[in-house]
């Protein structure tokens, strides 16, 4: 069961109830808190485009707590982040794994963050194939092309060599927030404001 909290905002015109995500959107905050599929990607892309239309100069904040998901859905979000004019700050809370870590690295350089106890996991794309040998060969060729594209982008976003990315993503590779900073996936580990 998915409960979405409601917040009440009082203004001089009365009270207004918002679901929490709509209220956060007013402050240019988008929450990616689930696996990434086409529906989630469409929602995130729509919010990014809406916020750009509202103000193309102000930063957008994308909070990520995601186990990853569909590569094509993730690329839809990634390409939109790169396409729109406002800088997108990415902040890892909890876990950014797989495509979640790819989107974490997609933020504007200098504006990619993780909380101190957040974890980041990188690996190669996963896939499966069945059917006739030719269908399996087509699927294998496609996943190898996808892996090469992901590795090239990760190398550009992190400053690591493609060879290093290939080595480090061969298996699940879990990083602490500090290790993610050292690797180049993020720029800073956020410290408590207290």
Swiss-Prot record:
Residues at the active site = 98, 123
Specify the enzyme's EC class, one word: hydrolase
Q: Which InterPro entries match?
A: ClpP (IPR001907), ClpP/crotonase-like_dom_sf (IPR029045), ClpP/TepA (IPR023562), ClpP_His_AS (IPR033135), ClpP_Ser_AS (IPR018215)
Its GO CC terms are: cytoplasm; endopeptidase Clp complex
The Swiss-Prot or TrEMBL record describes its family as follows:
Belongs to the peptidase S14 family.
Q: How does it assemble?
A: Fourteen ClpP subunits assemble into 2 heptameric rings which stack back to back to give a disk-like structure with a central cavity, resembling the structure of eukaryotic proteasomes.
User: What is the role of this chain?
Assistant: Cleaves peptides in various proteins in a process that requires ATP hydrolysis. Has a chymotrypsin-like activity. Plays a major role in the degradation of misfolded proteins.
Q: What is this protein called?
A: ATP-dependent Clp protease proteolytic subunit
- Provide the species name: Staphylococcus carnosus (strain TM300)
Q: Gene name?
A: clpP
């Amino acid at each position: 069961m998915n409960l979405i909290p409601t917040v009440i905002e009082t203004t001089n015109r009365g009270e207004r109830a918002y679901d929490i995500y709509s209220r956060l959107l007013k402050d240019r905050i988008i929450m990616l808190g689930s696996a990434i599929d086409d529906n989630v990607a469409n929602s995130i892309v729509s919010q990014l485009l809406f916020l750009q239309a509202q103000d193309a100069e102000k930063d957008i904040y994308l909070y990520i707590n995601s186990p990853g998901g569909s590569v094509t859905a993730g690329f839809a979000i990634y390409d939109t982040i790169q396409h729109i004019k406002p800088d997108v700050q990415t902040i890892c809370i909890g876990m950014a794994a797989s495509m979640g870590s790819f989107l974490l690295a997609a933020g504007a350089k200098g504006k990619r963050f993780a909380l101190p106890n957040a974890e980041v996991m990188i690996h190669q794309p996963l896939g499966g194939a069945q059917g006739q040998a030719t269908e399996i060969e087509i699927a294998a060729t496609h996943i190898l092309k996808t892996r090469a594209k992901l590795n090239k982008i990760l190398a550009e976003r992190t400053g690591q060599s493609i060879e290093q990315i290939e080595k480090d993503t061969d298996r699940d590779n879990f990083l602490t927030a500090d290790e993610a900073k050292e690797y180049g996936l993020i720029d800073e580990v956020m410290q408590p404001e207290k």
